[in-house]
Design a protein with these regions (language model features):
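Disordered, charged N-terminal biogenesis/targeting segments of membrane/secreted proteins
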Residues: 1-54
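Alpha-helical, hydrophobic structural elements that either
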Residues: 8-9, 30, 61, 75-370
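Small/flexible residues
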Residues: 38, 47-49, 63, 212, ...
Length: 370
């Protein structure tokens, strides 16, 4: 596993560029159809989705994430074979613009082939997909014809992050729900490229083999103080590629039941991978959310915390800690028996070697992983 993880790090930090290939797509139509479909496709039971409070990443814009939280049936090709109904706009895109670009799997990483789009002097290339059955990370390269455009960016921080974000959407055919965040990095301030990274958690168990559709509108500068958000470059850039990668999930040998503040938690699935940790569980309490005012009250927040703040802590052999207890994103579904199904995920702040994990705490239980 250590060798594979070293390969992940090398692939992410030393990405090679695919050859430029312009794609005319109709995904702006697909996006509109996708949002309209979701407005009428809410399930009878309440499904709640909450974003991770991740300190090291820039969250996707709230309006765009809200549109992607509950995804109606969609897709073509491989998705149709598994019973997922296609959106009409997606069918038009596939008919008139051709099928999705292929993605080959090399060293467990998905590598979209010739998947790029150029507009207004910027080429966006989908370079890599890394993931497991519950989370995925997509890495894009942004190549600027005019290097001076990047002079408007603030200096990168110690991790290479810059004060900019991508305004856009991405969904995968058949995805029932997704949440996540993104960031832009400048790994080499002397060249003409940036790296755009999307980290997402999904409610659907597996999306491998389906079609990913990215509609990226613009690259914006983060506001400072009272400054308004301004565009660095306007697109759009549309890309469509097969969602292929090797599932890197490892099952965590956690007991069937753990305790959380006096509540019984039944663990249905617990996995860890180089990209993060995921737990699906049922807890014998429900959240009482009073959303009439449009604001989250302290009582409602405490009620949500009572179902979602299950301790979720990963300790590495070198002492590093990934703590997703109160900052991770989660999906929840109320059940008629007064319990709640919760799917909680925590994407790691960096790609990790699972062989270097010493222990994992879930609820009141610590599992030795050494």
């Amino acid at each position: 596993m250590s060798k594979a993880t070293d390969e992940y790090r090398r692939e992410l930090d030393e990405l090679t560029f695919s050859s430029e290939s312009k794609h005319r797509m109709a995904n702006h139509i697909a996006e509109a159809g996708f949002i309209r479909a979701n407005l009428t496709a809410m399930p009878a039971r309440r499904r709640t989705s909450h974003l991770a409070k991740h300190p090291a990443r820039i969250a996707l814009r709230a309006a765009l994430v809200a549109a992607a939280l509950v995804i109606a049936a969609g897709g073509t090709g491989a998705a149709m074979a598994s019973g997922v109904l296609p959106l009409p706009a997606d069918l038009l895109s596939d008919i008139f613009d051709g099928p999705a670009c292929d993605t080959e799997v090399i060293n467990r990483i998905g590598r979209p082939i010739n998947t790029s789009c150029t507009n207004n002097g910027v080429t966006v290339t989908a370079d890599a997909i890394i993931g497991d059955r519950n989370m995925y990370t997509i890495v894009y390269t942004l190549t600027f014809e005019d290097r001076s455009t990047l002079d408007r960016l603030p200096a990168p921080d110690a991790n290479g992050h810059v004060g900019a974000f991508m305004d856009g959407t991405l969904y995968v055919d058949g995805e029932r729900g997704a949440q996540g965040s993104s960031h832009i990095r400048d790994l080499d301030p002397t060249d003409n490229t940036l790296q755009y990274v999307e980290q997402m958690s999904v409610e659907t168990s597996s999306l491998v083999g389906r079609t990913a559709r990215a509609h990226l509108d613009s690259i914006k500068l983060m506001p400072t103080g009272t400054d308004e958000v301004v565009n660095l470059v306007t697109g759009p850039w549309d890309l469509k590629f097969k969602f292929n990668f090797e599932d890197t999930s490892i099952d965590i040998p956690v007991p069937e039941n753990v305790d959380f503040d006096g509540a019984t938690v039944k663990i249905e699935e617990a996995t860890v991978s180089p990209v993060g940790i995921s737990v699906r569980y049922n807890i014998n309490r429900i959240a009482h959310v009073d959303g009439e005012s449009g604001k989250m009250s302290d009582r409602a927040q405490a009620s949500l915390d009572a179902i979602s703040n299950l301790p979720l802590i990963v300790i590495f052999k070198d002492g590093r800690i990934e703590n997703g207890t109160s900052r991770s994103g989660f999906f929840s579904v109320d059940r008629k028996d007064g319990t709640t199904d919760v799917h909680k995920t925590w994407p790691f702040t960096q790609i990790c070697d699972t062989d270097e994990i010493a222990s994992i705490q879930i609820g009141d239980t610590i599992i030795d992983m050494a």
